[in-house]
């Protein structure tokens, strides 16, 4: 979805980019429209949380210091980490690091957030809080595409479900949607 692998068969389009014919020089433009949440965080360990976020903004063209500061404060508040900007990543718990990664992913108000196993390294309670945060972000306008092996999450946060197998993506939403209970009523009315 973010241009890392070539499309082998069929067609794929992401945010108006044909992934079969996208030129390498256009991949950075596509990626600026995406937010990526890595399972293993990928935070810069020698920089504070604030500096990690500032690095992304500057790399994507932000120049105004006050606007950068305001945006960082805004996303840290969104993920419940407004008091953690001065911390280094190794001073944070796994759940806190994942929240910072989500803050980084939403910095540029992406149309799509790709979340690769965002709960994979977290305890159950923290994992649910992370999925709830992603669910709230989705409700505010960004699409969230999340990979998971935790099938319980699919029941608690229903949505479209796809399975990747044999180099294909198959819609399996019906397998995970709650079944509607129906009651048949036979009205036998004699006139």
Each language-model region and where it sits:
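Helix N-cap at the start of a conserved alpha-helix in ABC-type nucleotide-binding domains
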Residues: 124-126
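Short coil-to-helix segment of the ABC ATPase nucleotide-binding domain corresponding to the Q-loop/switch region
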Residues: 47-55
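Conserved ABC transporter NBD signature motif
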Residues: 10-18
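Conserved signature/switch motifs of ABC ATPase nucleotide-binding domains
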Residues: 87-90, 108, 140
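Helix-to-loop junction immediately C-terminal to a conserved catalytic motif
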Residues: 2
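Catalytic Walker B motif of ABC-type/P-loop ATPase nucleotide-binding domains
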Residues: 113-116
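Conserved ABC ATPase signature
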Residues: 88-92, 96-98
């Amino acid at each position: 979805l973010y241009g890392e692998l070539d499309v082998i068969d069929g067609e794929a389009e992401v945010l108006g980019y044909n992934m079969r014919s996208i030129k390498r020089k256009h991949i950075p433009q596509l990626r600026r429209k995406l937010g990526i949440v890595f399972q293993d965080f990928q935070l810069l360990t020698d920089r504070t949380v604030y500096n990690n976020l500032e690095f992304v903004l500057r790399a994507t063209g932000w120049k105004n210091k006050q606007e950068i500061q305001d945006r960082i404060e805004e996303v840290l508040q969104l993920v419940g980490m407004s008091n953690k900007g001065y911390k280094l990543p190794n001073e944070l718990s796994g759940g806190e690091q994942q929240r910072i990664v989500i803050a980084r992913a939403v910095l540029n108000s992406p149309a799509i957030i790709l979340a690769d196993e965002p709960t994979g390294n977290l305890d159950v309670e923290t994992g649910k809080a992370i999925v709830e945060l992603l669910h709230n972000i989705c409700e505010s306008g960004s699409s969230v595409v999340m990979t998971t092996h935790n099938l319980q999450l699919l029941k608690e946060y229903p949505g479209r479900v796809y399975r990747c197998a044999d180099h294909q993506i198959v819609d399996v939403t019906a397998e995970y949607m709650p079944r509607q209970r129906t009651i048949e009523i036979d009205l036998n009315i004699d006139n």
